[in-house]
């Protein structure tokens, strides 16, 4: 009797393929179950308030911008609007936007607080080393309008101007007070990637005589996103629209020209305007900024191929750092002693801490570019630690120990958004 070995092997091949498919299906079901749980946890948390987390008394604009999608979905839109408009009530005559505000009888941290006659129940402050407050506010308004459909908010009057006019003044503040003519980009103090701590001071949140001004990718990418958002929702005449289109076009050109290192396929950490505060004993150019790169991707500053390369580089850095997720802020980290603020040691806080607050946004970008396998891979460890810790935390050590504020709404917001985007693909 003659027979072919193929007939014997075929059932084994089919069994192997079936087993592989079952494993893949099981992993997918597991991820979706985790996502459903974390999404509900995020909604439950964000129904409870608007502060950044249990460790903060303030409503911070950079945080609010990252959970306003959820807040506008699960909370009364009139309440969300009130908290958003309060930032405009604190806007300064030069157009600048504060970081956060807190009930006037509840201040506890040593910020230089200031008051607003339009919101006497609060006091506010601004971390002047950072240059993302104005951009964050415009992005937050954009998200609020998209979810609620409340375009009328732009015509509301605050301090004698419409909200739209005040938002435009915020952008003009950046072009007037934070713009470097040589490079055609905006500047801030030297910080670690997207951070708000400069190295020259034991706290490091305010510009001073020791500040080293620098241009970085995070601030400029945030501004690009903000202008594009403004162009989407604002009612403008032809001349006004052309002006802002030219501004954003110039920013994008100059970002690629001066900040993008084509050979290394990464963004330069800083362009210094009055020298570097760091020792020349290490090469800062080797540092890869995860957060700033993520925001650059959101600003459409990288090609699809470069997005994939960026993700692979982030995962490579995670392995080298023995970290837990691509929320790793940067790698390699700044050495011991680089920052006078002792909380900024290696793998601590913004110097190599692991922040879902930014890693979750990279997941969203992977989804947007169609890299769904990579998005799920990146998302899984972020969901796992939320479930394990029974809540949301500000940041994590490389070995996944939660640090900083609990009930951190920024983490909840970006995970909620990524989960919604991922399962909208089906």
Describe the role of every protein-language-model region.
Residues 23-43, 59-60, 97-100, 175, ...:
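Catalytic cores of carbohydrate-active enzymes
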């Amino acid at each position: 009797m003659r027979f072919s070995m193929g007939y014997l092997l075929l059932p084994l091949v089919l069994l192997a393929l079936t087993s592989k498919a079952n494993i893949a299906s099981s992993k997918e079901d597991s991820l979706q179950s985790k996502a459903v749980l974390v999404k509900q946890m995020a909604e439950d948390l964000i129904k409870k308030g608007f502060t950044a987390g249990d460790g903060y008394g303030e409503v911070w604009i950079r945080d609010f911008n990252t959970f306003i999608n959820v807040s506008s979905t699960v909370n009364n839109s009139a309440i969300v609007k009130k908290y958003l408009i309060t930032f405009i009530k604190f806007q300064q005559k030069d157009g600048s936007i504060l970081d956060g505000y807190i009930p006037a009888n509840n201040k506890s941290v040593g910020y230089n607080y200031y008051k607003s006659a339009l919101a006497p129940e609060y006091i506010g402050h601004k971390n002047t080393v950072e240059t993302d407050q104005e951009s964050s506010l415009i992005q937050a308004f954009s998200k609020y309008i998209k979810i609620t459909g409340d375009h009328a908010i732009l015509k509301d009057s605050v301090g004698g101007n419409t909200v739209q006019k005040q938002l435009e003044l915020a952008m003009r503040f950046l072009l007037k007070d934070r713009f470097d003519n040589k490079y055609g980009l905006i500047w801030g103090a030297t910080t670690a990637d997207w951070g708000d701590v400069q190295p020259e001071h034991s706290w490091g949140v305010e510009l001073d005589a020791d500040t080293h001004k620098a241009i970085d990718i995070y601030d400029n990418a945030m501004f690009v996103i903000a202008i594009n958002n403004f162009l989407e929702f604002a009612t403008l005449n032809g001349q006004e629209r052309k002006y802002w289109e030219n501004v954003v076009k110039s920013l994008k050109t100059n970002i690629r020209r001066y900040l993008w290192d084509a050979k290394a396929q990464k963004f330069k950490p800083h362009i210094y305007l009055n020298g570097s505060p760091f020792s020349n004993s290490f090469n800062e150019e080797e540092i890869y900024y995860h957060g700033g790169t993520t925001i650059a991707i959101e600003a459409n500053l990288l090609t699809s191929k470069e997005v994939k390369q960026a993700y692979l580089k982030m995962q490579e850095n995670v392995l080298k750092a023995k970290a837990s997720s691509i929320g790793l802020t940067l790698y390699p980290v700044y050495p011991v002693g680089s920052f006078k603020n002792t909380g900024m040691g290696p793998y601590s806080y913004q110097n190599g801490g692991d922040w879902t607050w930014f890693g979750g946004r990279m997941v969203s970008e992977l989804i947007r570019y169609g890299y769904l396998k990579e998005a799920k891979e990146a998302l899984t460890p972020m969901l796992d630690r939320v479930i394990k810790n029974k809540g949301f935390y500000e940041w994590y050590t490389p070995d996944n120990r939660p640090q900083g504020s609990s009930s951190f709404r920024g983490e909840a917001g970006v995970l909620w958004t990524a989960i919604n985007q991922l399962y909208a693909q089906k």
